[in-house]
Design a protein with these regions (language model features):
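A short, N-terminal "cap"/entry segment at the start of jelly-roll beta-barrel domains
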Residues: 1-40, 48, 124, 142-146
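Double-stranded beta-helix
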Residues: 2-14, 100-135
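Structural motif
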Residues: 35, 72-74, 96-98, 106
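Conserved hydrophobic/aromatic positions in well-ordered beta-strands
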Residues: 37-39, 66, 100, 110
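Conserved short histidine dyad/triad with adjacent acidic residue
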Residues: 38-60
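Short, conserved beta-strand element in jelly-roll/cupin
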Residues: 41, 57-75
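Short acidic-glycine-tyrosine-enriched beta hairpin
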Residues: 77-96
Length: 146
């Protein structure tokens, strides 16, 4: 019999985890296999100055699917493409970007994609599963029927 799915609820006002970094904070709640993040960035916050020293990557490697609650955020991709997001905007931001707060108002974002490992030192993140991917690439032997 299939397992019955049930509704779930959590609040970002009582997060599972809080990560604090220079001029910013991330509140996380996970349920149903999804990690929701509420990021708050203060005026003067810039990813390459506030988070890069923690994660030790050249660009933000997290993909984001975001709803922008307040403030203005400018994002530049590694190829030089730029876009600015403000209240009410939704956005998809691929890996390899930098971002910063525009103006004097804090930025608040709800992210449903890229916050699970955001602002987490590289050593604290799980290793990529190369062995598992290689195993999947091998052809499977056919089972013999008896």
């Amino acid at each position: 019999m299939p397992k019955k799915e049930s509704m779930q609820q959590k609040s970002l006002n009582a997060p599972d985890e809080v990560r604090v970094f220079d001029r910013g904070k991330l509140e996380l709640a996970s349920l149903g296999g999804v990690t929701f993040g509420r990021a708050t960035f203060q005026p003067g916050w810039k990813w390459s100055e506030s988070v890069k020293p923690l994660v030790k990557t050249e660009w933000c490697e997290a993909p984001h699917v975001q709803y922008h609650v307040s403030g203005r955020l400018r994002v530049v991709m590694y190829d030089g493409t730029e876009m600015e997001f403000g209240p009410g905007d939704v956005g998809v931001i691929p890996p390899k970007h930098d971002a910063w707060v525009v103006g004097d108002e804090p930025v608040t974002i709800i992210d449903i994609s890229g916050m699970k490992h955001y602002a987490k030192p590289k050593a604290a993140r799980p290793a990529k599963k190369k062995a598992k991917a290689a195993k999947r690439a091998k052809p499977r032997a056919k089972k013999r029927r008896r």
